[in-house]
């Protein structure tokens, strides 16, 4: 590596070079616009190179404003000095200006590549070490030397001087003293960015011009010394393009957001010291973008590994579940060896499946005349499937038996046979009946023939054909039986039967009997009410003071006092005996007789009433007065004797005449009187006539 003095020079040289670079940059800034305009119109390749390099410069970090434009004083001085000093540099044309700009862009792209890598590592994107500037400037100087040697535009002595001058100018432009103009330059760049209201194509062109103006600081410092020598050439342009493409691959990784981020960081880090910037930038070799950020696969794998298990998340099959679940062992097979003899039967050549109709049946047991029982008409016969069979006698039952032939061999006989005709049809002859037989193949589920062996079944054959039977003609007995059975079946289904009316309706007869009973009850009620009215009339006709006594004649439990009281009343009142006779008529003796006796007594009472009102009423009254006068003291005595002795008994009859003196003569004679025999003395004898006869 070259010596530090050769690379950077002394401080005096750096100051002079700063002035020259400032003037050069000012002059170049004045002439930048016409040259860039000529490049846009004259050379598309130069414009594309600038656009390409400007994009690289925008993606990478930007150097300080002092490196770009220099001091304000230098800009003013350079603008005044540019007209006189570099007036001859305008004749270079678009090709030389394009080459010079490409050189400046090349240095900018190197800076931008290093800045973009440092921005990914979160270091300061705008601060570069002096060593890095010197290395980049030395490299560019060597390239310039090689180009000058090839073209011969400058002398051997001038090329290192110009290279040193460019290095010194670059070093001077990168010094911390030039950082004071960064706010103004950023403001200018901020004005230039939003001031492009054009399409994308136009914007890219204008960005290229603005990029030339921004990033022309390094190139302008070189141009200030190299304009006199006119060292630019086509080879330099090609090399700068190659270097720009190589640097673009590194700087393209930065985004617009990183550019904004680096611009904001520049303001904060502008006040930092050079020692801090040197310590930060001398960190060693810069890592690549993949080393900084890693790949997407690494991020996903690390996040999956560090992710904790959620409480409800089930464990994977590899997380130890193998030991928890033991392998299921297969169940041991149970084999039982059973020896069953094989039964082979002679089934014949053809095997048919038959569903017997209801007019055919088979007797499985051999026929024996000794145990044969004929079928009865009144019994219902059901087959093994529960269907009702027609009650045909011998004609519809297939029977068989075993017998010996003449030679003594056992032969099986049957009452049925199947005849196969020449056309292939078959007929069943059962006794005198003939049935047509039809064959049909079995489709779907096939029926199998089994032989029962103990509790199991042993298969013998599979049925593939079935037979159906039909009566041959309608004149057969089977057909007649079938039609009759159908008629009976239809008649049984009738729910309502009409019966002839053989007698009277029991309901109407019952209603008539009820009506008769009600009439009889009403007649009896009318009769009783009529009798009651007749009695009431009789009571009202003979009502007097004697009937007003309370139940004197109705109660048997009353003592003899009532009788004596009545006798006392009859003593002072006339007609007492008549009332006693009237009382006898309605006495309880009438209850003991029959209905005819009651009717006779009632008629007698009526006659007595009529007689009392007649002619003999006065005579009877006189006789009664005499008898009552003669028998009054006897009545008192008798009543006294009955009270003292207590042997005078009444027989429960309501008799008011009778034997008062105890001589047995109790006749109360009179015309039209009914004599009642009364035993008053208790001897049980009474000669009075109580037979209901009238004494004339």
UniProtKB/Swiss-Prot annotation:
The keyword Transcription applies. GO terms for molecular function: RNA polymerase II C-terminal domain phosphoserine binding. It is found in: Nucleus. Residues 105-116, 158-186 have a biased composition (Low complexity). Transmembrane segments: none annotated. Residues 60-69, 127-142, 199-262, 526-539, 649-659 have a biased composition (Basic and acidic residues). Residues 36-46, 117-126 have a biased composition (Polar residues). GO terms for cellular component: Cdc73/Paf1 complex; nucleus. It comes from the Eukaryota. Residues 1-15, 294-303, 316-331, 639-648, 660-672, 680-696 have a biased composition (Acidic residues). Residues 1-336, 526-560, 584-696 are annotated as: Disordered. Residues 511-537 form a coiled coil. GO terms for biological process: embryonic cranial skeleton morphogenesis; glial cell development; heart development; melanocyte differentiation; neural crest cell development; positive regulation of transcription elongation by RNA polymerase II; spinal cord oligodendrocyte cell differentiation; transcription elongation by RNA polymerase II. The keyword Coiled coil applies. Component of the PAF1 complex (PAF1C) which has multiple functions during transcription by RNA polymerase II. PAF1C associates with RNA polymerase II, is involved in transcriptional elongation and in histone modifications including methylation on histone H3 'Lys-4' (H3K4me3). PAF1C seems to be required for multiple steps in cardiac formation. Involved in heart development and required for differentiation of the atrioventricular boundary. Required for neural crest cell development. Component of the PAF1 complex, which at least consists of cdc73, paf1, leo1, ctr9 and rtf1. The PAF1 complex interacts with PHF5A. Interacts with ctr9. This is RNA polymerase-associated protein LEO1. It comes from Danio rerio (Zebrafish). The gene is leo1.
